[in-house]
Amino acid sequence: MTRHDAQLYELKKKIEELKKIRGRGTELISLYIPAGYDLSKVMQQLREEYSTAQNIKSKTTRKNVLGALERAMQHLKLYKQTPENGLALFVGNVSEMEGNTDIRLWAIVPPEPLNVRLYRCDQTFVTEPLEEMLRVKDAYGLITVEKNEATIGLLRGKRIEVLDELTSNVPGKTRAGGQSARRYERIREQETHEFMKRIGEHANRVFLPLLEKGELKGIIVGGPGPTKEDFVEGDYLHHELKKKIIGVVDISYHGEYGLRELVEKASDILRDHEVIREKKLVNEFLKHVVKDTGLATYGEREVRRALEIGAVDTLLISEGYDKVRVRAKCNHCGWEELKTMSEEEFEVYKKKLTRCPKCGSQNLTIEKWDVAEELIKMAEEAGSDVEIISLDTEEGQQFYRAFGGLGAILRFKI
């Protein structure tokens, strides 16, 4: 899992949290600031909105909107300039008890540049611009190769994009005999070699930046004859890109139609590639658990300890894992409690804990954060790999049901 993948996973969790929140009136503020936008203009807009909000008829809604705007303006003062990818703020009263005020703020620096500027005060938060980032799927490189032409493309989700089309000067076959035929064949071979070099150079220029960003999940090469095998086996692609080739497919067409045929013919390869990789990881984890090799562990406490001592090779987290870490503290006597629970359990816990169990004070502070996000950050700091395990496979379901969706393959026994 690359840093970009981890950021998208964290973003998904935050969006899920934001979408659950409902305001009692139109009092939840969503603010999107694109990369490079002047923050002083945003502050000016918020001051104008603050002035307008003073005319809201409902006393409660007016109080909540003004409180949210004040909190947003205070937070923006922390920035000298807009973060590199822009900034999204979500602010509002999240208290479920009428008459109570609990103004919360979420500040999200997205993993990809924001290109929208938006201010909205509504009953729900506006998350669509961020959700759009989640809809961008892994990218697969596509190359179709023939003697005389080649096409380079990209598959993102269901969208096939033609990035480059090349043609060659490779001459056709000749009927000449003797030395002329051999000389002509050498010319054809040299022209073919030069053409393949050119294809490789263009592919390297397109795919290497995607590989560096962790977006390139594989490359599929297709063509009607043996030319595609010659291209794959030769030293035309960058060595790191050659490692990403996951399939070589026979196709009949070229150009955009060729890319579409390539994707259609390679549908099993594309589908099985991620599934096989995931199965392999889970099966390796299961093997260590069953054989009791000491090189696998599971459960939050055990995984957390393994991360703390740098023992984790690969952290496995199910996409269904939804635990949160909760810290409750009494501001009067100092009593403190730290627990891990589900979101549903947290809602019950929050309603029940109205007084300090030690001194009876109602002056309590309750903090909550996502366990998966915390463990991913710990893994990154420890140099461990992170893999999100889907619920789409039998192995993924087994990992979630039997181990709670959290485990680790270890570097050494602990």
Swiss-Prot record:
Alphabetic keyword roster: Cytoplasm, Protein biosynthesis
GO CC terms: cytoplasm
Family of this protein: Belongs to the eukaryotic release factor 1 family.
Functional description taken from the UniProt entry: Directs the termination of nascent peptide synthesis (translation) in response to the termination codons UAA, UAG and UGA.
Alphabetized GO MF terms: translation release factor activity, codon specific
Compartments where found: Cytoplasm
Stated name of the protein: Peptide chain release factor subunit 1
Main location: cytoplasm
